[in-house]
């Protein structure tokens, strides 16, 4: 099986594009961290939902104002105004996965023998996550092997 990774690939020679992509990834990571903190606080409610979509919808109910939901306990729009909804949902899904993994690891750690278990699992954080840039409005294909942001 051949494995491929895009991390070491330089996307463009243009410093402006690299700065833009780096800034986009930084904002996305902050959004993931925001949703991780919400998931940690509201995990009992979020984990009770069925499927990934149900969990994402539950977190959105806590964080996203709508015409029917004028107030929310954690206002995502205050710090991330005009954040695209598809990136927001991807960030929520990423956060739900990280918190779910943390909770599972913590449960296993607590159940293991104190004399043989390792260190306590670390609090989840966004780390080096990247947003998927495959949506139609994320880039414009300019040729067979080229695109512009």
PLM region spans:
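Nucleic-acid substrate recognition interfaces
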Residues: 1-149
